[in-house]
From Swiss-Prot:
GO terms for molecular function: flavin adenine dinucleotide binding; oxidoreductase activity, acting on the CH-NH group of donors; tRNA (5-methylaminomethyl-2-thiouridylate)(34)-methyltransferase activity. In the N-terminal section; belongs to the methyltransferase superfamily. tRNA (mnm(5)s(2)U34)-methyltransferase family. In the C-terminal section; belongs to the DAO family. This is tRNA 5-methylaminomethyl-2-thiouridine biosynthesis bifunctional protein MnmC. The keyword tRNA processing applies. It comes from the Bacteria. Its EC number is 2.1.1.61, 1.5.-.-.
Amino acid sequence: MSQTSLHHARLDWNEAGTPVSSDFGDVYFSNDNGLSETRYVFLQQNGLPARFSHHNSDSFVIGETGFGTGLNFLATMKAFLEQAPQTGNGARLHFISFEKFPLTRDDLHKALTAWPELAPFSQALIAQWPLPVPGCHRLHFAGGRIRLDLWLGDIKEMLPQVPHGEQGLVDTWYLDGFAPAKNPEMWTQDLFDGLARLARPGATLSTFTSAGFVRRGLIAAGFAMKKVKGHGSKWAMLAGERVDKKPQRTIVPWYARPAGRDGEVVIIGGGIASAMTALSLVERGRKVTLLCEDHELATGASGNRQGALYPLLNGEHDALSRFYSLAFGYARQRLLSLAKHHPIAFDLCGVVQLGYDDKSTAKLAKMQQGPFPHALMRPLTPVEAEHECGLPSGHAGVSYPLGGWLCPADLTRAAIKEAQASGLLQVEYDCPVTAIHEQVDGWLVASREGRQWQAPNLVVAAGHQLPALSPFAELPLYPVRGQVSHVPTTATLSQLKTVLCYDGYLTPAHNAEHCIGASYGRNQSTQAFSAEEQAQNQARLQACLPDQAWPAEVDVSSNEARVGVRCASRDHLPVAGPIARLAGLADHYARLQRDQQNPAPLPLHPGLYVLGALGSRGLCSAPLCGELIASEICGDPLPLATDLLEALHPARYWIRKLLKGKPLN
């Protein structure tokens, strides 16, 4: 996928107050009541909102080719909430849209003031409006009943990356955008073919244009199209539906992510990963039982007082960087939403990362070559770094202005309380799981005390204890011990305004104490206090800032600290998804290196999922990974591009070897 930076739309405003694209010379919506045109062209011609009432699956999926001001989405959301059934688990709306030139937040606000009847929905959109970072940004509305996947970037690149199975994904297409004469690069046969590929059998489509080449192109792609009366004074427009659906998919069989079984889900875990997964599942109406090993939540790696929240980026903007740039935005969204109703200690005060030696300086310099807006990451001179964080370092660095710190345990508890409010989540404490057993129609989970639970679906989010449970022992994961020191603030240390990252990190004061850490003990899982690591936490700060006096005020002598054990992977990415049957996998894919045309699907343990290896970035990655697992189980659209799904797939370690013709060992 392209690493090109995104640019905000450049707007003019005409006499009617309508936004006009400076680059394309076209209006974003009709001067003559654009909302009325939206309702006629896209809702009425697609049989909406009536189809919402009798849709035969939990989630109705709409795709749109040009998000613009979001008018189509907002009008659809209003109609859905007015029409869709409220009984049972409730129908859900999933809206997928693409935008190459997103509006600024201020321009979006100005444009949407034209529609006061949509104000509550507009405000929710503006509050979550993402940064111009390429990829899929998932936003939640109406308590999770409505999800918007906003794919920022060129639709020619993004559309082939939308994951879907053989029978498509989309129930209705809104073919919108600037007029074909104004933006001919978008209106191509490749686009029409892509819409057909993602369309489910019988999916409908409508568009404001009646251009002959558009009609012919859609027919060639597999739609039955007709001209109908246009809106208002417009003579005609196009409407139709998908016919002659041929099985096509974007997820290759060896990275399969089939939907889970209907019914309940059991989750093993008690930290941020399991909490976020549970929340995303109950938002979809699933009953969940969470099995927590301890007598309370977040006693493991999720139990630190303060954890830094910022993205892991690099100049190549590879899969790692792309995933974390999107996960960061989603984590912020989840945090701010939960903090409205639950007590969470946090401060999005920013994060400053220093180039403290030649290697780290070169790494930051290369990172600045990536396609990142300054609102996500911007370079700092030594003077700017001091001004930003409040204390001198003598080093240049970068700022993550939207980052900060939060209490992981508070976030974990908030997610669980929010999920419990639905009445669909039951938490069982003091349940150390010792074995899981596959059954014909689900999974049996057994605890040390002999208690048992059964469910069609099982998610294991047990942190560094994952390898202790079969069939997870073969995953190439490892434990990482980390000790965080708690130090009292001083008059000088209290001037620290942001999280400061170097060869370690130091948080601003909270309750008159700072957190400094953390030690890194690979393949170590002991949790006893270490005086040596306590001293090392302070020594690393002094070593990185040798010319500064204030690090000497960091006093670790009280031996106040907390030890946690994280679970990590070799490639620093989480494992999130279904679990493959390793026995016979090499024989199953013996010819995969040479023949990738008709391979059999990946042999999986049905209904079994894993979420782990979050490492030291769990605050950033857990919310999006939990949403991914829930989407997968429920058969919903997935919130990441296909190549990122491959990068997170638990089977990636073995599939990569098989694709290279290497033996599995």
